[in-house]
């Protein structure tokens, strides 16, 4: 199934429509190996994991087991099932600041609009864990909302936190950085350097 078909099936799902084209564009530009190991931190509504699965990637995704926020209660599995990509997505509960994965396990890690929901005190630890669990040539990709996106979000959720800048947590690590921008999101793509 392609992105256009998925959008038609999920035509009532406004968050999916808001992110899928840009997320898909970024994934396409990254030219990831179809056999690569991919982690999606912060499942939420499942939009990032589903976008990856629609592109044929197998994905591990997860949230903290003790997360009772509105985002963690979303039926991402039902959405993935509707799109027939549920078999490509494995859910595993975990905390991003202390991941239960081996060193160098993942080729690519995605964090779609979740860093700004994490406490400031753990964000540096989250970055360290992403670096620890990616391969030597690993890629870590954060998506964060723009001011325009926050204005839209805050119409329904006035207390929604400000976007986070993942660059602040890269100090001391040998990473290259690229950015991709859309009206609603910024993708920060960090690549490990030897």
Region roles according to the model:
Residues 97-109:
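A short acidic, Gly/Pro-enriched loop at the edge of an enzyme's catalytic core
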Residues 35-44:
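Conserved class I S-adenosyl-L-methionine
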Residues 47, 51-98:
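Class I SAM-dependent methyltransferase SAM/SAH-binding core
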Residues 2-21:
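Class I SAM-dependent methyltransferase Rossmann-like catalytic core
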């Amino acid at each position: 199934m392609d992105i256009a078909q998925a959008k038609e099936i999920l035509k009532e799902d406004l968050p999916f429509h808001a992110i899928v084209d840009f997320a898909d564009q970024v994934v396409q530009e990254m030219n990831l190996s179809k056999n690569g190991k991919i982690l999606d931190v912060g499942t939420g509504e499942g939009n990032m994991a589903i976008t990856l699965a629609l592109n044929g990637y197998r994905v591990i995704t997860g949230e903290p087991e003790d997360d009772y926020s509105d985002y963690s209660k979303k039926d991402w599995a039902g959405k993935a099932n509707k799109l027939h990509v549920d078999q490509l997505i494995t859910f595993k509960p975990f905390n991003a600041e202390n991941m239960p994965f081996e060193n160098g396990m993942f080729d690519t890690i995605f964090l779609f609009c979740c860093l700004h929901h994490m406490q400031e005190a753990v964000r540096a630890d989250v970055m360290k864990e992403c670096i620890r669990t990616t391969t030597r040539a690993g890629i870590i990709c954060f998506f964060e909302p723009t001011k325009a996106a926050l204005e839209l979000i805050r119409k329904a959720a006035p207390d929604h936190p400000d976007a986070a800048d993942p660059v602040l947590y890269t100090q001391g690590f040998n990473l290259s950085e690229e950015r991709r921008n859309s009206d609603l999101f910024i993708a920060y793509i960090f690549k490990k350097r030897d």
